[in-house]
Design a protein with these regions (language model features):
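Signature of extracytoplasmic/envelope-associated structural regions
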Residues: 1-160
């Protein structure tokens, strides 16, 4: 199958956050500004008297993601808010991390999906495992929450 000729735009995108209990939160009222860094392992350059003679892989990278959404609610005891879901508070206080053994922080899975199938384009997604999300609040018109994520697990790109 040939690569799609339909270009993704913000209205095609969806961001879903899932915890270790398989409970999902679909980000709503978002700006359409999802970003991801697909860095490779650290590069160790091998020199012989100042001439490059090799390249080796060093430490694994810590890829990053970011996105923002409009503030709708800071906390809720009976329903998930995005901040409660990410920080494991209030209604989400009993959530399980996706990290597993050896990972102390609360981690989640983040999926970005771009669905252009309505225009005969592709329906594609990228899944980020073991993500540590943090948030920053900025007052404005509208007030927004910016999220930054560090990816400590695998990254898988796939067709849906």
């Amino acid at each position: 199958m040939a690569e799609s000729t339909v270009v993704a735009v913000p209205r095609d995108g969806t961001i879903t956050i899932t915890n270790g209990d398989a409970t999902s939160y679909t980000v709503a009222y978002e700006a359409g500004d999802f970003n991801a860094n697909f860095d490779k392992a650290e590069r160790i350059v091998i020199y012989d008297r100042a001439t490059i003679v090799g390249l080796r892989s060093g430490s694994d990278p810590i890829p990053s993601i970011s996105f923002s959404c409009h503030l709708r609610e800071l906390a809720d005891d009976s329903e998930d808010t995005i901040l409660d879901f990410v920080y494991k508070t209030n209604n989400s206080s009993g959530a399980t991390s996706t990290g597993g053994t050896g990972f102390e922080q609360f981690l989640v899975t983040v999926v970005f999906q771009a669905d252009m199938s309505a225009l005969s384009g592709s329906n594609t997604k990228v899944t980020f495992e073991k993500v540590l999300l943090t948030a920053a609040l900025a007052e404005g018109n509208p007030t927004s929450i910016s999220f930054t994520g560090e990816v400590y697990g695998s990254i898988a790109r796939a067709t849906v």
